[in-house]
């Protein structure tokens, strides 16, 4: 990844490093530019850090008002995404984690160094920049979970002092409490994941019942537990005084575009943002604010509460009334005018919106230059604004599929992607498969819908196969036919034998690489799905009592042969007779 080409903001915030659109690391920084750049400008002592840097394909930034906001957001996003590298790198060394061991009668411990983060031996929560020991003590008091090093496989002659202090139920001695103990461990984990509401409601019901039964001692215990749980929630969720689902919605119109940024708060914690834009070209509306708001929430779930700029309160008044009447669950709309937490979050949303707008126009200029370079260097008749790219995926001709990805103005247009299951059976090879898919795609496509460029993943052989079909169909003139050979990233133009070689750091080449890689990814995913179904079907065909209907039911419920292998007899019996379930267990090893 060329970090020099990324416009990194110089403010506090959180960065999400990604590979294949999956978050692999979440970090925070007082100055994002300094922190993120430091990953790329030197060789690190830690092999894991070097490995992380090699795997970074994209970085997303989330700007915050303060470093504390960044810290809170980082913790929430780590819990949301469980990124691969977060528990392995040095960034968390100064922050303790809470570890719940994976063993009979789990223990709770504080761990501080990365060396102790062995995910096979336990589940980790954190990092906690402050209050970890207090939190652990509260949890022990609430759930009576042990924190000792005693061997739980043995029975001790007597419990330790903590049993008599009522901060442990003594599993080292009393083995018959296992079921209740495990339930307490699960409740403890839910609290650490931020899910306190359900447990508080359960304890409130128990407290009220105990009070009605005149068992005031038990009622007081429940009351104190509720107080402690609320204390945990408030220390973790300091953004708000209460738990709620809320969107902080801001937008800005520039020329013929509306840019939208929404901070998503769920259960009182900010868990991410949604950034998008709406094309306003040739659109007519009496109230642009209503149109933008309704356009966004026609595709997204409307939360219980929304925060919007006070500037738009009058313009959105009709929307507010309509949504309040239409939805049986009352919606809350907030238009903060004075300094408050909601106003701070609104400012944070605007900060991210400005960043999104800057990034959009910067990227748009870069892409536009790339499109122009492709047109000029390759001598194309049209600017390559719409590209359809084809890739073939198979293993020695088996489970062969083709995929088509689409790029419009240099950006992926995923709604237009297509996949094809190859039909030709006679000595299938990549060339004949390419001929088949090109014919299926373009034989009936109206001339007006042809793309500017048809891009083939491959070299001269593949491009000539595609050209033969388009020529026979009399449609070779409708699009530029090009191919991208993966080995040296050479670009072939139909009718020419000498390839074009572009500099690897040119946006022109990257436009083709992105759409080619998308076709490859899309095709591989489809190929694996087809192959998996075939393997499952062939395995199940060996078993008496399984026909087409039962095979389909098993596939629908379990999805893979390994999942069927792992399923218990009871789970299998839900859809097939016990005799057939036993046959599956005996024959599928």
Swiss-Prot record:
<feature type="domain" description="UVR">
    <location>
        <begin position="197"/>
        <end position="232"/>
    </location>
</feature>
<dbReference type="InterPro" id="IPR010994">
    <property type="entry name" value="RuvA_2-like"/>
</dbReference>
<dbReference type="InterPro" id="IPR001162">
    <property type="entry name" value="UvrC_RNase_H_dom"/>
</dbReference>
<keyword id="KW-0228">DNA excision</keyword>
<comment type="function">
    <text>The UvrABC repair system catalyzes the recognition and processing of DNA lesions. UvrC both incises the 5' and 3' sides of the lesion. The N-terminal half is responsible for the 3' incision and the C-terminal half is responsible for the 5' incision.</text>
</comment>
<dbReference type="InterPro" id="IPR050066">
    <property type="entry name" value="UvrABC_protein_C"/>
</dbReference>
<dbReference type="Pfam" id="PF08459">
    <property type="entry name" value="UvrC_RNaseH_dom"/>
</dbReference>
<dbReference type="GO" id="GO:0005737">
    <property type="term" value="C:cytoplasm"/>
</dbReference>
<keyword id="KW-0234">DNA repair</keyword>
<dbReference type="Pfam" id="PF14520">
    <property type="entry name" value="HHH_5"/>
</dbReference>
<dbReference type="GO" id="GO:0003677">
    <property type="term" value="F:DNA binding"/>
</dbReference>
<dbReference type="InterPro" id="IPR000305">
    <property type="entry name" value="GIY-YIG_endonuc"/>
</dbReference>
<keyword id="KW-0963">Cytoplasm</keyword>
<dbReference type="Pfam" id="PF01541">
    <property type="entry name" value="GIY-YIG"/>
</dbReference>
<protein>
    <recommendedName>
        <fullName>UvrABC system protein C</fullName>
    </recommendedName>
</protein>
<keyword id="KW-0267">Excision nuclease</keyword>
<dbReference type="GO" id="GO:0006289">
    <property type="term" value="P:nucleotide-excision repair"/>
</dbReference>
<comment type="subunit">
    <text>Interacts with UvrB in an incision complex.</text>
</comment>
<dbReference type="GO" id="GO:0009432">
    <property type="term" value="P:SOS response"/>
</dbReference>
<dbReference type="Pfam" id="PF02151">
    <property type="entry name" value="UVR"/>
</dbReference>
<keyword id="KW-0227">DNA damage</keyword>
<dbReference type="InterPro" id="IPR035901">
    <property type="entry name" value="GIY-YIG_endonuc_sf"/>
</dbReference>
<dbReference type="InterPro" id="IPR004791">
    <property type="entry name" value="UvrC"/>
</dbReference>
<dbReference type="GO" id="GO:0006974">
    <property type="term" value="P:DNA damage response"/>
</dbReference>
<keyword id="KW-0742">SOS response</keyword>
<feature type="domain" description="GIY-YIG">
    <location>
        <begin position="10"/>
        <end position="87"/>
    </location>
</feature>
<dbReference type="InterPro" id="IPR036876">
    <property type="entry name" value="UVR_dom_sf"/>
</dbReference>
<dbReference type="InterPro" id="IPR047296">
    <property type="entry name" value="GIY-YIG_UvrC_Cho"/>
</dbReference>
<dbReference type="GO" id="GO:0009380">
    <property type="term" value="C:excinuclease repair complex"/>
</dbReference>
<dbReference type="InterPro" id="IPR001943">
    <property type="entry name" value="UVR_dom"/>
</dbReference>
<dbReference type="GO" id="GO:0009381">
    <property type="term" value="F:excinuclease ABC activity"/>
</dbReference>
<dbReference type="InterPro" id="IPR038476">
    <property type="entry name" value="UvrC_RNase_H_dom_sf"/>
</dbReference>
<comment type="similarity">
    <text>Belongs to the UvrC family.</text>
</comment>
<dbReference type="Pfam" id="PF22920">
    <property type="entry name" value="UvrC_RNaseH"/>
</dbReference>
